[in-house]
């Protein structure tokens, strides 16, 4: 009997949507992302104060009524401590589950695309393990948008593309065939620039892609050592 009640509760439960809002320009948001934000009242936003997060500031420009929704801040601290991360992801899932149990959908905003290095996925996995339905809504990735802003391609013909998530894991000399994307490269820019110079690759960097403070640099020498957190580098094989 209890199992039947649990199944009925899940049948009546809300759905968790992981919605990508793109890298910065609200015009990059998809029609589906805009519709889901408009149609649902509970919006989860990664950060201690929802209104101060980058994801919220992007989305509210495209969906002004977002300001009147029930905003749920979700703490996602930047840490490499596995135990701390696990605890925060569990607590985030607990918060989301409270709304799903009450039959409310939750739209969880995430920068770029939720399938690319998004902490949202850790929450989704926990929600799915608890038996709830989830759905991913694609957004434009930062590296696709950055390539467009730099007016260049990422790959052509049969070229390979290597996407590296963070500079602290950059321990190679970029010597694999194909082109590289270095995400969130600002923390150790001096080290990154030296590796780029040695590689002999053609380099472009977009800082704060799609935002009011966006800047595009077309060579290693142009890139400042104090570039910001949202700095994305595209390093392409030099053309002979």
Positions of predicted regions on the chain:
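Structural signal for conserved beta-strand scaffold positions within catalytic alpha/beta enzyme cores
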Residues: 45, 72-75, 136, 156, ...
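Class I S-adenosyl-L-methionine
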Residues: 2-3, 7-26, 31-33, 38-132, ...
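A short acidic, often aromatic-flanked loop/helix-cap motif at beta-alpha or helix-coil junctions
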Residues: 76-82, 169-171, 211-213
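Class I SAM-dependent methyltransferase SAM-binding "motif I" and its flanking Rossmann-like core
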Residues: 115-176, 224
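A contiguous loop/helix-start segment that scaffolds small-molecule binding in enzyme catalytic cores
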Residues: 16, 174-240
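Short, surface-exposed amphipathic charged segments that create phosphate/polyanion-binding patches used
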Residues: 84-92, 149-152, 175-179, 217-222
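Short beta-strand segments
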Residues: 18-20, 109-111, 164-165, 182-184, ...
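Short gly/pro/ser/thr-enriched loop/turn and capping motifs at secondary-structure boundaries
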Residues: 50-52, 79, 141-144, 211-213
């Amino acid at each position: 009997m209890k199992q039947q009640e649990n199944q009925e509760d899940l049948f009546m439960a809300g759905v968790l949507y992981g919605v990508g809002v793109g890298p910065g320009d609200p015009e990059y948001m998809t029609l589906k992302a805009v519709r889901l934000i408009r149609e649902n009242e509970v919006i989860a936003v990664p950060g201690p104060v929802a209104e101060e997060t980058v994801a919220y500031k992007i989305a509210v420009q495209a969906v002004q009524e977002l300001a009147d929704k029930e905003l749920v801040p979700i703490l996602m601290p930047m840490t490499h401590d596995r135990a701390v991360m696990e605890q925060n992801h569990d607590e985030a899932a607990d918060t989301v589950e409270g709304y799903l149990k009450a039959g409310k959908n939750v739209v969880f905003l995430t920068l770029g695309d939720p399938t690319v290095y998004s902490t949202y996925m850790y929450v989704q996995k926990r929600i799915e393990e608890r038996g709830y339905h989830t759905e991913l809504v694609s957004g434009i990735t930062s590296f696709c948008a950055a390539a467009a802003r730099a007016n260049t391609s990422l790959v052509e013909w049969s070229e390979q593309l290597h996407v590296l998530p963070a500079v602290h894991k950059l321990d190679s000399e970029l010597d694999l065939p194909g082109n590289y994307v270095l995400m969130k490269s600002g923390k150790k820019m001096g080290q990154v620039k030296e590796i780029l110079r040695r590689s002999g690759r053609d380099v472009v960097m977009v800082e704060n892609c799609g935002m009011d403070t966006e800047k595009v640099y077309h060579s290693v020498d142009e890139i400042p050592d104090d570039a910001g957190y949202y700095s994305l580098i595209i390093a392409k094989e030099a053309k002979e």
